[in-house]
A protein has these predicted regions:
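FIC/Doc superfamily catalytic core
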Residues: 1-199
Length: 199
């Protein structure tokens, strides 16, 4: 770890290494499960569907898995956006490592396509845009501050680090939730970025 590796410094804070080890142990147990290995495609599809449903629920859309499975095309823009994001995540992993801001813009386009004006899709918010705050996180940073911190986050993500992916993913998720760089769908984007960081 170098002094300039800020993510590794966070990974070495008290309690973090133990939490990472506990998470790895739990994941290793799942990876060792015979049935999960044998039916990995089916499990991946189900996990993506459940992830999209959970993301929509956190944004205030209480759709059940049964309802989601029965829908041809969801009318709720939150549910539809979460499903679109989940479906496209696999195609964004390589770009995420090189150009995270580009991927964040794409994730916002997918998440918010049915909810915001086309001119706002994929673009960070401006001073005159309201911010949807389903988690009641309080006042977001100003657009200028959000843009500055988004640039810093992008620089951290494209720099080499010794930090475990779990720590990097937690930082990405927390910072994007805090910044709410887009006026709508920020939670969906933050959770998708977390998943991309773990891949």
């Amino acid at each position: 770890m170098t002094e300039s590796d800020a993510l590794a410094q966070v990974a070495n804070l008290p309690g973090v290494p133990d939490a990472v080890d506990d998470a790895r142990t739990a994941v290793d147990r799942l990876l060792g499960h015979r049935i999960l290995r044998r039916r990995s495609a089916e499990v991946s599809t189900e996990a993506a569907l459940r992830g999209a449903r959970a993301s929509a629920a956190l944004e205030g859309s209480p759709v059940t898995l049964e309802e989601l499975r029965g829908m041809e095309s969801p009318a709720d823009p939150v549910v539809h956006g979460a499903l679109r994001v989940s479906a496209e995540l696999g195609t964004l992993t390589e770009t995420w490592r090189k150009a995270p801001r580009q991927v964040l813009a794409r994730l916002h386009v997918l998440a918010a396509a049915d909810a915001v004006d086309g001119a706002e899709l994929g673009r960070p918010r401006t001073s005159d845009q309201p911010v949807q705050d389903a988690l009641d996180l309080g006042e977001p940073p100003s657009p200028a501050e959000a843009a500055r911190r988004l640039e810093l986050l992008s620089n951290l993500l494209t720099a080499p680090t010794q930090a475990p992916a779990l720590v990097v993913a937690a930082i990405v998720h927390g910072e994007l939730l805090s910044l709410r760089p887009f006026g709508w769908g920020g939670g969906i984007v933050a959770r998708a970025a977390l998943r991309l960081t773990l891949v």
